[in-house]
C-alpha cells in the first residue's frame, strides 16, 4: 500500500518543542527511579513494550466473526519519530503512562489526507491541561500547554490515557516510605561502629552539655581510628536490636509493596515473599505474567489510541505483535533439562 504524500503538520505548536535544553521528566519521577524496585519494574515493562513490532490490519466480517486482514505498515509504524528509534519512542510513551497515567505525542508531519505521518514524544511532566489537574484523567483535553506555552491546535497532540493511575499518584505513600527507608539506610551505612549509646557508670552526674561533648568526641575518634578510648566512668553499650537490621527488614517489605503498586509479580523484581520461591513454573511463565499483569493495560492503551480515527482511516488498526513475542520468549526462556534416572542394573 503506497503512502500518501507528506506535508507539514498544521500549527506551529509550542515554541519549546524539540528545544531539549528545556526538557525535563520531573523531579518526582527522577526521585522515584532512585528506588531500585521502581527502576527494575519500569525497566522490565519498558524492555517488553519498547521491543515489540507493530502490525497493521483491517477487519472483515466472515458471517460468524471478524477476521483480521494484515496490511503493509506505514512508515510511522516502523519509526514514529524519524529522529529516534521505535524503541526509544514507545519506551518513553510507556514510562509517562506508568508514572503519570498519561502520555503525549506531538504530530510533526501529516499525509495529504490530514492524518499523522510522524510524531515526537513530549515529556508528560512538562505538559499541563488547565481543565484537568489529575490524578484521574477523564478524557483528552481541549487545551494543552507544553512548558507553559499553549499548543495552538490540540489536535496536533495525541493524548494517551492510561486505565491505571500513575505510580506517582497511586503509589505516593509507598514511594514516600521507601524513600525514607533508603535515607535511613544511607545514614546507617556511614556509621563507624555498631549503633549504641554511652552510659555513665559512676562519678559526678554529668549535665547534658558534657554528655553531648563526650558523645561527639567518641564519634569523632571512631571516624578517625578503629579503636576508641573510654574511662572507668563511661561505658559503651550496643542496642539490643540493631536499627540497621530493622530498616533492612522494612526495606525488604517495602520492595514488595512497590512491586504490588507497580502490578509486577514480586519475584521478577526479587522482592521477598514469605512462603514462596522461584520454581521452574515461575521461570517458564515469567514473560507471560509480566505481560498479563503488568504490560497489557499499557499496550492496549497505546495501540487503541493509535488506531483511533484521528490517526488512522476507518477500519484500519494497529497492534503490537505480542503473540510472536510470547511464542519466541516462551520457547527460548528455559528448556526443562533431561535427567537420566534409569536404574543401574545389579552386578
Show where each model-derived region lies:
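Short acidic alpha-helical/loop segments enriched in Asp/Glu that coordinate divalent cations
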Residues: 227-228, 266-277, 308-312
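Beta-rich nucleic-acid/ligand-interaction surfaces
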Residues: 237, 278-280
Amino acid at each position: 500500500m503506497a503512502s500518501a504524500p507528506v506535508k507539514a503538520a498544521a500549527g506551529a505548536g509550542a515554541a519549546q518543542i524539540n528545544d531539549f535544553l528545556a526538557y525535563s521528566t520531573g523531579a518526582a519521577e527522577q526521585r522515584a527511579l532512585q528506588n531500585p524496585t521502581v527502576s527494575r519494574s519500569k525497566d522490565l515493562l519498558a524492555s517488553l513494550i519498547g521491543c515489540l513490532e507493530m502490525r497493521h490490519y483491517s477487519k472483515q466480517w466472515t458471517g460468524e466473526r471478524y477476521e483480521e486482514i494484515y496490511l503493509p505498515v506505514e512508515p510511522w509504524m516502523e519509526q514514529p519519530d524519524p529522529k529516534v528509534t521505535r524503541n526509544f519512542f514507545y519506551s518513553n510513551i510507556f514510562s509517562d503512562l506508568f508514572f503519570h497515567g498519561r502520555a503525549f505525542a506531538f504530530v510533526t508531519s501529516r499525509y495529504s489526507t490530514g492524518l499523522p505521518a510522524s510524531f515526537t514524544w513530549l515529556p508528560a511532566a512538562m505538559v499541563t491541561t488547565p481543565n484537568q489537574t489529575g490524578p484521574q484523567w477523564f478524557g483528552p483535553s481541549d487545551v494543552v500547554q507544553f512548558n507553559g506555552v499553549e499548543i495552538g491546535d490540540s489536535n496536533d497532540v495525541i493524548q494517551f490515557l492510561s486505565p491505571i493511575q500513575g505510580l506517582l499518584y497511586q503509589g505516593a505513600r509507598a514511594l514516600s516510605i521507601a524513600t525514607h527507608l533508603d535515607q535511613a539506610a544511607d545514614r546507617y551505612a556511614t556509621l563507624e561502629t555498631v549503633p549504641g549509646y554511652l552510659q555513665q557508670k559512676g562519678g559526678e552526674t554529668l549535665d547534658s552539655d558534657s554528655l553531648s561533648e563526650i558523645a561527639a568526641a567518641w564519634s569523632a575518634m571512631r571516624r578517625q581510628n578503629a579503636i576508641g578510648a573510654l574511662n572507668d566512668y563511661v561505658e559503651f553499650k550496643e542496642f539490643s536490636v540493631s536499627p540497621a537490621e530493622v530498616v533492612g527488614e522494612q526495606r525488604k517489605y517495602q520492595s514488595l509493596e512497590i512491586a504490588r503498586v507497580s502490578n509486577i509479580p514480586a519475584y521478577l523484581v526479587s522482592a521477598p515473599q514469605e512462603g514462596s520461591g522461584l520454581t521452574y513454573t515461575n521461570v517458564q511463565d515469567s514473560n507471560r505474567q509480566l505481560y498479563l499483569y503488568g504490560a497489557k493495560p499499557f499496550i492496549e492503551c497505546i495501540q487503541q489510541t493509535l488506531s483511533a480515527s484521528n490517526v488512522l482511516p476507518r477500519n484500519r488498526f494497529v497492534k503490537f505483535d505480542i503473540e510472536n513475542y510470547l511464542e519466541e520468549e516462551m520457547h527460548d526462556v528455559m528448556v526443562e533439562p533431561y535427567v537420566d534416572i534409569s536404574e543401574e542394573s545389579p552386578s
